[in-house]
Structures are given as structure tokens and as C-alpha cells.
Amino acid sequence: MPKTEETVLQNDPSVAENGAPEPKTPGQSQKSKSFCLDDQSPDLIETVNEVSKLSISHEIVVNQDFYVEETILPPNSVEGRFAEAMYNAFWNHLKEQLLSTPPDFTCALELLKDVKETLLSLLLPWQNRLRNEIEEALDTDLLKQEAEHGALDVPHLSNYILNLMALLCAPVRDEAIQKLETIRDPVQLLRGILRVLGLMKMDMVNYTIQSFRPYLQEHSIQYEQAKFQELLDKQPSLLDYTTKWLTKAATDITTLCPSSPDSPSSSCSMACSLPSGAGNNSEPPSPTMVLYQGYLNLLLWDLENVEFPETLLMDRIRLQELAFQLHQLTVLASVLLVARSFSGEVLFRSPEFVDRLKCTTKALTEEFISRPEETMLSVSEQVSQEVHQGLKDMGLTTLSSENTASLLGQLQNITKKENCIRSIVDQWIRFFLKCCLLHGMQESLLHFPGGLILIEKELAELGWKFLNLMHHNQQVFGPYYAEILKHIIHPAQAQETDVEPN
């Protein structure tokens, strides 16, 4: 069969066997790759299709950068070599057919049929005249009759198709079509036409996504609720993991004091005062506080734990990415605080120095999770050099050998999870995220923890992502959460505060 341009959904490497983009539920098991729907019941197939639709709609709404993009298998990979061999075999077979006496147009007719369907799919609803023209010029029965009489003019049809493509394509494809016009070999020309048509289909899909995004955003909550309810009706146990997740959150919030001597700052603590008696362990927590505790727990989720709440499965990959960013910011802020404590405030009043130190630390801590000791050894040495050079450039007293050794030791000690500075920074960051959930981003920024001021920009960006994602989830699944929480916390308290976003 001809090679069609492979495309994938951004942030999702899954591709269906026929080359069409297929959504994949985050957290999907690798074993599912061998799962064959053809052998399953119609109800299961319908459920999978509904989940796919829901996943794509959700992705478009919450991911502003969502689009379909071209992907090419690595040429040296087994998959890449196999695919290339199969495609070459097809095109060589087509060439043999066209060069035979008399010419065999079997494969050519199939290709022209595919080209016709693709061209028609690129038309807008009101382009009826052009639609009729394509139907007539590429009429399958007529082309078949011409082929039977050996009169099928492939070069002429290819030129006609190129003219249509030039008319329908986005400006970004003009150059590719101009290159096709210089190809004289009919087989290579057909191959190029199909490749560029695949890109044009991708462009049309992205245009459609962009056009429909405002509509989807306006109706996404009702749509996702309706689709999820349909799935819940078919599978009543669909909220089992969600119930476990909220139960654990309720336990956590009643056993952990919401504020402690190590809490960020008094101003931030006051801004994030906990409603509905959540600050008193003798009182049951409100549904909203339990839900927000559950959201924060997602950033600590064990990757080996498969019991991920069903209502957040579509955001699992995003939450994992946010958890990774949170971890990176914790290490970054810890490094900056230690470095500032040794070098003094004067050096850290230089934006150029702070930015340079942040860039260096970010680059070196990319592999902190997999190689913490080696990473922090490199970080400590580089930061020590930066501090020494920075103090020297500003005409300040450089660190003594003793202080340098102490700086290196404290930086390397950040590797340990129980490190005092790292633990406090982690508390500050999570407390800030709780502030964002409770009171919104603007108020939280007004009471930003002083100890995190060096990463204010990065943490605000993380907070926005987390807040927007959880806000959308709360709007969609709030009614389900409220119903579950009625059975987890005291009924009177459950009715006191609805699970609605602030």
C-alpha cells in the first residue's frame, strides 16, 4: 500500500496502524498495544470510541498548544527500515505495472481513488462546484473504463491533481507543490502527491481544531459531563479509584495539621486560611478542602500505583509533568537559597547573575531524579565557581576555603529528601499551590512566600497550569465528587460547602 504521511497528536506518540492519529488515555498499559478490538464485543468497541472522542475533546480544551503534527520513524530503527522496505516494494510494484505491456493500472486506480477522497475531504461545505468538478474528473467508473482500454493518462491526471492541490493548500505547502511540478517520473510524482496530500489533510485537521476550539471551550463542561455519565451508566464501577483517592485525601487532611511552624510566612498563612473548620482537627473537613488535598496529592503520586482516579485519567500525563516541574523548582530554589546564604544579598541583587545561576542549575538538574548524587556534585562545583566569579567581578570579598567547602557540602546535601532547606522549600511550594486553589492566582501572588522570590516567575507559571487544569476538572466532575464525599465526611459538613470552583 502507498506510504501515507504519519501524523500524531502532540504530546502523544501513539499512531494507529492505518496512519490516522489515535488518542491514548494517559497511563495506558503497554500491553494494550496488542489489544485487538476486532475480537471484542460491540459494546466494548463503542466504549473505546466514546473514550477516544472524550479524550480528544478534552485535549483540545485544556491544551492550547494541541495540534496534529507530522512524525517520521527514525530511519535506523527496525520500524523505520521495515516501513521503508514495504513502501518501496509497493512503489516498485506500481512501476512494474505501468511499464508492463499492456500497462496494468490496478494499483494506479486505487491510488487515484484515494487521491480523490482526500481532495474531497479538503473542500469546505460551500465548495459545491469544485466538488462536482472533482467527482466528474476523477470518476472511478470512467477511469476504470479508460484503464481497460489502455487509455488512462496518468501524467495528465497528475497535473490536474497538482493544480487542485495548489488551489486548496495552505501557503506553507506552496513550495512542496512547486517541487512536485518538476518531477517527470509518474511513479515518483504520485508518491510525492500522496505525501503532500497527507500534509494538507493534517493542515485541515489543525485548522478545524483551531476553528472549533472556542465552541468546545464554551460547551466542554456539559459535553464531558454527558459523555462521562454515559460511560458511568455502562460501567457503574467507574468511580471506584476516585472514591479511594478522595477517601485518602480526607484521611490526610484530618491527620496532618494544615499549618505548622515551618509554614511559609504569616501573611501567606493568613491569606490561605482554611475554611469550614479545616484548621481544627476536631471538626470534619469541608468537601472543598478534601478535594483540594486530593489534587495536591496527585503531585506526589507513585508512578507504580495503577489506582489513579478515573476522573483525572485524561490529565495523568500532564500531572506527571507538573510533578516533575515542581520537583525541579524545589531543587532550584534550594540551591539558590544556599548560594545566597553564603554570598550575601548584594550579589543576588544582580538580575544577570541570578538568571545565569538559574540557567546553569536548571541545565544541570535535568537528570536529578535518576542521578541525584552525580547531579548535585556537578551543581555544587559549578555554583561555587559562579559565586566566586560573581563576587570577584563585583569587587566583593570572595569565599574563604572553609566557606567554599561548606557551600559545596550544603549544596550536595540537597540530594537527601530529609534535607532541611529542601523540605521547607517543598512545603512553601505546596502551600502556595494550595493558596492558588483556595483563593486564585492573583491573591496568592500578593502573599507570595518571600523565600521563593527567586523563582517567582517559574512558580507562578506552574501555579497557573495547575490551577487551570484542576479548575476545569472541578467544574466537570464537581457533582460526582460531592456525591462521593457525602459518604466520606460528616453529612452536615458535606452539605455546608459544595464542591464548586472558587
Swiss-Prot record:
GO terms under cellular component: acrosomal vesicle; sperm flagellum
Domain of life from the UniProt record: Eukaryota
One BP term from GO: regulation of sperm capacitation
Positions of region (Disordered): 1-36
A Pfam short name: Tcp11
InterPro entries assigned to the protein according to its UniProt record, in alphabetical order: Tcp11
Family that this chain belongs to: Belongs to the TCP11 family.
Record-given protein name: T-complex protein 11-like X-linked protein 2
Species in which this protein is naturally found: Homo sapiens
Gene name of the encoded protein: TCP11X2
